């Protein structure tokens, strides 16, 4: 009986390990393919970063592309809203990168001017420029807790979610923080952390394959 129970436990453990390894391989391959798509726009990224004196932020630009579109589609940096005030207007990758880098440069410049950290500028790429002044008034450094407060009490109600309702958002950062939730119309309070993670992925890829 004990042998049988041990065999069942052993088989169960093996199945779990196999599933975990298989899942890790699947996600690693999916990430690798997405990064390859992002890297395919190296020429356009270099041109835009040189144009806006953002050469030191190439990896960050790529991380934003990976975060926003995984290198697929036309509006790679989801730049339509910053350029036109609405989504799905830009339908050209080069235009999207040019506008995205321009907007990111504006956020970085404003964050430096206000004495805030780089993470604030990155989060403002998602929340909008007003977030920078908010961070300045609250210590000058972006945190998920501060971003959550802004999302819940300012951005979300401003865009119509007065009841502060939430929806499911399955990312490592969100699951560990609050079980996996964002506020409707409240942007992504985990944006800066996700971009930071993706920047490390970009850098690791380039060290291995470039």
For the regions a protein language model found, what residue spans apply to each?
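Poly-acidic low-complexity segments
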Residues: 7-9, 56-57, 75
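Short, solvent-exposed loop/turn elements at domain surfaces
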Residues: 73-75, 204-205
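Short, solvent-exposed loop/turn and secondary-structure capping segments
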Residues: 74-77, 135-136
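Short linear capping/connector segments at secondary-structure termini
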Residues: 77-85
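Short, surface-exposed loop and linker segments with low hydrophobicity and enrichment for Pro/Ser/Thr
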Residues: 49-50, 58
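Short, functionally critical alpha-helical segments immediately adjacent to catalytic or ligand/cofactor-binding
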Residues: 55-71, 79, 97-101, 121-127, ...
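Non-catalytic cell-wall polysaccharide-engagement segments
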Residues: 2-38, 44, 51-52, 87-98, ...
């Amino acid at each position: 009986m004990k042998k049988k129970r041990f065999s069942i436990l052993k088989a169960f453990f093996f199945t779990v390990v196999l599933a975990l390894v298989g899942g890790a391989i699947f996600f690693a391959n999916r990430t690798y393919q997405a990064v390859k798509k992002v890297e395919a726009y190296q020429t356009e990224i270099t041109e835009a970063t040189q144009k806006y004196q953002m050469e030191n932020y190439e990896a960050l630009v790529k991380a934003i592309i990976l975060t926003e579109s995984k290198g697929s589609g036309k509006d790679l940096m989801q730049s339509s809203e910053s350029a036109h005030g609405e989504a799905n207007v830009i339908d050209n990758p080069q235009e999207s990168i040019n506008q995205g880098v321009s907007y990111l440069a504006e956020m970085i410049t404003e964050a430096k001017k206000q004495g805030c950290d780089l993470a604030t500028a990155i989060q403002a790429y998602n929340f909008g420029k007003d977030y920078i002044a908010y961070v300045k008034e609250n210590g000058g450094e972006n945190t998920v807790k501060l971003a959550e407060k802004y999302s819940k009490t300012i951005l979300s109600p401003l865009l119509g979610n007065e009841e502060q309702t939430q929806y499911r958002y399955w990312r490592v950062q969100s699951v560990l923080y609050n079980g996996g939730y964002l506020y409707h119309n409240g942007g992504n309070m985990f944006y800066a952390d996700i971009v930071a993670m993706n920047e490390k992925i970009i850098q690791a890829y380039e060290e291995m394959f470039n």
